[in-house]
Amino acid sequence: MKRYIRQSFLFLAVLFLCGCASTAAIKHDNSQQITLSKIENHLGGSDPWEGFNRSMFAVTSFVMDYIARPVGIVYTSIIPRPVITHIKNICLNLAYPTRALSCLLRAHWQGAGDETLRFLVNSTVGIGGIFDPAEYWWNIHSTESDFGQTFAAWGIAPGETLTLPLLPAHNVRDTAGLIFDIATDLKTYIPYAGETGATIAPYSSALTTVNNLSLTHEVFKQVVSDSNDRYKNYRQMATFFRELQLRMWRYHALNTRDNLIKAGKLPRPLEKSPAVIKPEWLRGEWLELKDFGPGSPVQDSLRTILFRAQDDSSYWYMPPSVFNNCFSNRRKDRNLALFPNRPELTYAFWSMPEPEEDKNGNPVPRREKLAVLLPGIGGTAPSATPTAFAELLNKNGYAVLVIDSTFTWQFTTARSGCRLPGFLPDDARAVRKIIKLALNDLKKDELVFNPEIILTGYSFGGMHTLKIAELEKNDPQIGFKKYLAVNPPVSLAYAAVQADKMAESMNKYQPQQVVDKVINTAGIFMANMANAQVPFKENMSDLQKGAYRLQADPETAAFLAGLYFRSSMRNMLFAAHSERGLIPLSHLPVEFTRNKLYLELDKITFKEYAEKYLASEYPGVKLDTLYRKSDLNSLAETLKNDEKIYVLHSINDFLLSENDRKFLDSTLENRITWTSRGGHLGNLYYEKVQQKILKMLE
């Protein structure tokens, strides 16, 4: 005990020195944009020890990949998920003194009382903390407090970013707080129990360590997956998540909900959806979506996160388990070499579902069907929307092939010369070549034989789908039965302007004001992404329907959507700059100091990308020609005459101008369906929309 007390006072002294010496907040320059990296640096500091932090993170990354992953596969295959959860519950229950003292020392009396009640209830009714009846029966929620939060409440600045191997703290203040967390954790004083503050530690028991690793690795994998700079993703997500913790967002949100229910103010009566009048000029099919609720087109679009794979979790087994047969685990990742001496491109494949059997137990004959799916900007096979779309198709009898968007770093680095995307004719030719290679690869291994193939894409992938339809009409190479584009932009120039406006919508605010505006929405999003909602049905009760309405003001919704588009472009540009250098950029992609480069990359607008970066890829082509050939108006003849082409769109998609809507409608006529709401992809969670997609592909 004395050892921990001495260490605690020592680290407290260091904490005050470092905290006073440096603050995380950076003075705001009103002439500069509010970008993702600027917000990250405002919350976490400018990372002057970036080289050291990246080196330490590399150790964590190595352990997660080469120790935690194989150990987790074995452990989670032997130990069912409920047992792993119960062990975690016991560890959390024994950490009660840490959370209670943290609340007491910052005069958060309600939190201290709730933590004490939780400990008493879970230790008795919950059988030593194995179960959590305090949460599930009596709505007594954990504050998730620690001493880092206490020090923050005392006004101690976080200091600079400090990453140490396998520790959950990410700055000087929170690292010092870990010592106090350990000293006040009951597991520290129970032989062979160990403590749960660190991911792994010499004083942890083997069981605690392995259990923590199996849980931590899954979170780590989600944070760094699909990243070409793991440290950047990790720091970014850790910084934002820590801000939610410091504000005790989950605790306050749950208590607010409980109090409103007790007061009879929840569930609130559903706000009526404003009437959407079918335009007089519309010739295509009109699909009315009821009970969507009020909201701007961008607010509608944020509901994309509600479109999730349904069979993507197992009650009995964690994701690493060999017995977990959820939809994501049935995905086969396969690699293609597009060019010699270039990184291979990974594509995803799901086999057709098992055939139904007749009364004699024999498989019922069926057609072999393959759906090729092209995601939008930043979309890769493991991400949420492509996975949900693939599951929708797979459940309805299709084998599914998913190819990463051209607007990803993976696709860019696999292309010859690391060519930048955005010129529709070139991108579509490259995608068609990859589809052909993937089909040959699948046939070689007898995963498909002679399937009936349909091509579908959404957003930017929808544009590629329509351009490939034109290429196939002029030079048939694959033989698609049908094409379906969902919410394709018409004009990349117009779409780029809209995306830039959204990303710059909060430039008038100080960084802290931006954080205050978006943090609640970020918490709501994280809560929704943790649990998949069933498809929305219009005959649901008002209580059920209310769960699908996300709270985000129009300005915040626009800013978050713009950040997503910009971050996808940033990751792609970073990969290209690392590969061959991009002349307009002034900072080099140095291995251990990249913060200034990211600040520069984040400020690049889509307009600037087209004029300075994409145009330089085609020195003999004028910019207006690049725009014109990347516009769906250039495909007017094909769209009008090819009966295999279908489009599903939202009448209020913010990436379409009024002229764009009229062009699509007059050109496609009865082969386009307009939904009354949804913005850009924000209605895919509606059962009615999902059924329409499947019907259009028949």
Q: Which residues does each predicted region cover?
A:
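A structured, mid-to-C-terminal "fold-capping" secondary-structure block
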Residues: 29-43, 149-266
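Short, surface-exposed "cap/lid" segments of acyl-processing enzymes
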Residues: 352-356, 361-408
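Alpha/beta-hydrolase active-site loop
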Residues: 421-445
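Alpha/beta-hydrolase-fold enzymes
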Residues: 470-591
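Short beta-strand/loop motif that positions the catalytic acidic residue
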Residues: 647-649
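Conserved alpha/beta-hydrolase "acid-adjacent" motif
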Residues: 654-660
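Catalytic histidine-centered segment of alpha/beta-hydrolase-like enzymes
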Residues: 678-688
